[in-house]
Amino acid sequence: MSIKPEEISSLIKQQIENFQSDVQVQDVGTVIRVGDGIALAHGLESVMAGELLEFSNGVMGMAQNLEENNVGIIILGPYSEIREGDEVKRTGRIMEVPVGEELLGRVVNPLGQPIDGRGPIETSKTRPIESPAPGVMDRKSVHEPLQTGIKSIDSMIPVGRGQRELIIGDRQTGKTSIAIDTIINQKDQDMICIYVAIGQKESTVAGVVETLRQHGALDYTIVVSASASEPAPLLFLAPYAGVSMGEEFMYNGKHVLVVYDDLTKQAAAYRELSLLLRRPPGREAYPGDVFYLHSRLLERAAKLSDAKGGGSITALPFIETQAGDVSAYIPTNVISITDGQIFLQSDLFYSGVRPAVNAGLSVSRVGGSAQIKAMKKVSGTLRLDLAAYRELEAFAQFGSDLDKATQAKLNRGQRTVEVLKQGLHEPLPVEKQVAIIYALINGFLDDIPVGDVRRFESELFTFLDHNKKELLDHIRTTGNLPDDSEFKAAITEFKQGFVTTK
């Protein structure tokens, strides 16, 4: 059998044409140092900043320091199995988290993986955790109220949708309680809530989840938890993961509330990572870009223009102070980024004024334009009255013979403080807040003993609910006060039947 040369050449041509290469080219590096949640790798010449990298045991990392001879990687998971000399390869992707309505009612870690034992989350949508904030022309000024259900906040330090309002105070002053009450109060308000727990005890997070479940608030809430036992990289990423989940809803025209509890622990985790990556330390050993750490996060909260769908993200970041020192580095940074702050004072908390809001140091820079007219009308002088009372209270301790005007101011002040007290997880609808503050400023409480004020309040609400529901409905639907004489007549009618304790 003779083999013809032209047949051989055509066979070879055919083989070459049909040849399929299964070789995949991958950029691979080698781990040269690992420890404390940080790895240093050689190679990876063309890696991107923030790119996801995969170690040989399947654990993911994120490229942070891009240096001439090596790459600093933060490890997003357990690092005890990673050894010097291990391979680390590029994925070509940047850090993303799953997003969508499937996450509602779930507890996830900062990578979007469920940690509540209720099975996988069926969503195919993802968003990068770092994304640019909406530009100037994409925004609209804050004009819709976000009712927290807390009298002292909704009356004196109002929050609007799209605002960033800092909640600042020492540990154990009721910061988390304010956030939980605000989330509970969003029921039936078409609002999606995201609670980001950073460096909290797992028992605390479990308690928060259970409280939300009991009040039916978990159905519209996503809990993102990076507990104290997690590595620093996850604590650093948790807030960005939370806001990315919120952006998916915002850009679809929905309203979102994101609570960051708390950013002090995120800053500490970022300081830890930066020092391990050998970045130069600055004031209080924080790296030079710690301001940018928080500003790029909080700038993503916005009220979008109508052309962009009119959605919003409202941010409630928490900062924990040491002995009430608001002039430390991180507190001053975040105060300068946000649109106001609610300052909680431990002295007030321990003296039984809860929520322990210090009205003098608290401010809302843009919330006033979002307040309903009825609340604006009744609460106009509340802050000044309270400040005057605090001043007189200190003065009155030194002398007993006070003139009638001073005594009247002290009496009104005591009742104001009493009215602004509120039980835990008892948020009030805005129409009831308006009713009790209206009664207060019009002198209906001046002759009620201080000890009876809380009872007067609850019985007034019951009376209005059963006998004068149209007054409350009018405030809720129109945002305006009802007819003055009608409102006063209703409160007078109730007061005549109110029995004070002897």
Swiss-Prot record:
Entry coiled-coil feature ranges: none
UniProt-annotated binding residues for ATP: G169, D170, R171, Q172, T173, G174, K175, T176
Keyword ATP-binding found: yes
One Gene Ontology MF term: ATP binding
Region of interest (Disordered), ranges: 114-139
Site note Required for activity, residues: S362
UniProt topology in membrane: Peripheral membrane protein
One Gene Ontology cellular component: proton-transporting ATP synthase complex
Cell compartment(s), UniProt: Cell membrane
NCBIfam families: atpA, PRK13343.1
Protein name from the UniProt record: ATP synthase subunit alpha
Species in which this protein is naturally found: Halalkalibacterium halodurans (strain ATCC BAA-125 / DSM 18197 / FERM 7344 / JCM 9153 / C-125) (Bacillus halodurans)
Species lineage: Bacteria, Bacillati, Bacillota, Bacilli, Bacillales
